[in-house]
C-alpha cells in the first residue's frame, strides 16, 4: 500500500533531488496547501521519503521519530568535505582495509549506543541557519554529537580491490550514515566517504510502498488504483 490515507504519501526520492525539491514539486502538482516530510534524505541519496499532506503534516512530528533502514556503499581510502561522493576530496591513503578489520569495528558499533557527530554539510539548524550554508561559507562552528544506535546490520559485500563495502543498516532516528562511514574508517586508521545510499524503510513504510515522483498526480487523483 502506497499510503495510509491521502494525508500521507510515500515517495521514492530520486538522486540529485533535495527533500525540499520533492516537497515543493508535490505541493505544486496536487495543489496542496501544506506539505512536509518526516526526515531529510540527502541529495546524493535515494529511497523512502515520507510526506505529510495538509492535515497529514500534523503526523510528521511523530513519524520523524521512526527508526530507518538503509543500504549503503562505503568507499575506503578517500575522504571528502561532505562525507559523501558529492563533496571535494580532502585526503587519501594507499592503505587497504580488510573485511576482517571492517567486520570487527562494525560489530563494536552494533554492540552499544554511540555518540555520533553529524556532518557539517547537513540540514541541521545552527542558530537559525542550516549547517551546510555555514559550511559553504567556511564559518567555524560545532555540531553537538548525538546518541545513536544500530539495531541491525548485514555486510552484503566487500570488494577488496575497489575498497568498497556494501552494508544494510537498521538505525535509530538522527543516525547519519555519512558520519558512520567516516567513524568506521577512523576506527581502523583509514579514510572513507559514502559512495551511495538508499533509504529502504522509514518506520512502517518500505520502499515497495513508494511511488515515483512522476506518479504523484495520478496517485492523488486515482488513489484506489494504488491501494
From Swiss-Prot:
Keywords: Isomerase, tRNA processing. InterPro entries: PsdUridine_synth_cat_dom_sf, PsdUridine_synth_N, tRNA_psdUridine_synth_TruB. The active site is at 42 (nucleophile). It comes from the Bacteria. GO terms for molecular function: RNA binding; tRNA pseudouridine(55) synthase activity. The keyword Hydrolase does not apply. GO terms for biological process: mRNA pseudouridine synthesis; tRNA pseudouridine synthesis. Its EC number is 5.4.99.25. Responsible for synthesis of pseudouridine from uracil-55 in the psi GC loop of transfer RNAs. This is tRNA pseudouridine synthase B. It comes from Ureaplasma parvum serovar 3 (strain ATCC 700970). The gene is truB.
